Structures are given as structure tokens and as C-alpha cells.
Regions:
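An amphipathic, aromatic/His-enriched active-site/gating alpha helix that lines ligand/cofactor pockets
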Residues: 26, 30-38, 56-90
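Short, surface-exposed ligand-recognition loops at beta-strand->loop->(often short) alpha-helix junctions
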Residues: 11-17
Length: 100
């Protein structure tokens, strides 16, 4: 099975971590309901406090719909002034079964 993997890294401005977290939690809650979403996680680095979204999508079309969704647009707008920057990697992937 092939799918799309997204790794989006967000560096919060100093003091903004507590403001970004509830915004991200709301985004995750709504995104997990989307058609075409396989998985969507919000993580925080124990090393430097950077946030990361790790996402799996059935298709590029599903990812595109997500990026146009009201909850994604709201998160993007509300978090823009709270972040130093954001880096995104989008990969085509295929599941590998290591135990066959």
C-alpha cells in the first residue's frame, strides 16, 4: 500500500508554546475525522521544544483537501505570529513488512 507522509516542523517563538499547543490539539482532533487521513500526530521535541506534525494520507488529493479545510486554515492563521518558522517535507511512501 502506498500513501503520503508529511513531516511538518514548527519552531515556536519564545513563550508561545502554551498558545500553540491548544491550537494544534484542535487541529489534530478535526483532522483525524477527515476522509483520506490515515494518521495525524502532534509531537514535541524533548531536546529543543520544536513541534512536529507527522501525518499519513491516502492520497495527494486528501492532503490537498486537508490544507484547504477550515480547521487547517484557522490553525495556519492563528499560529503564524507564534512561530519562528515552519519546514515541511512531503514524501511518497510504501509500507514495508520487516517480518515476512
Amino acid at each position: 500500500m502506498s500513501f503520503i507522509v508529511v513531516m511538518a516542523e514548527l519552531a515556536p517563538k519564545e513563550g508561545a508554546e502554551d498558545k500553540i499547543t491548544p491550537l494544534a490539539e484542535a487541529l489534530v482532533e478535526e483532522t483525524l475525522k477527515e476522509e483520506g487521513n490515515i494518521d495525524y500526530k502532534f509531537l514535541k521535541s524533548v531536546k529543543d521544544g520544536t513541534f512536529m506534525f507527522v501525518e499519513q494520507w491516502e492520497s495527494v488529493e486528501a492532503l490537498s483537501k486537508h490544507m484547504a479545510s477550515p480547521h487547517f486554515q484557522l490553525f495556519s492563521k492563528e499560529s503564524a505570529d507564534l512561530a519562528e518558522g515552519m519546514g515541511i517535507k512531503v514524501l511518497g511512501a510504501e509500507e514495508v513488512n520487516l517480518y515476512e
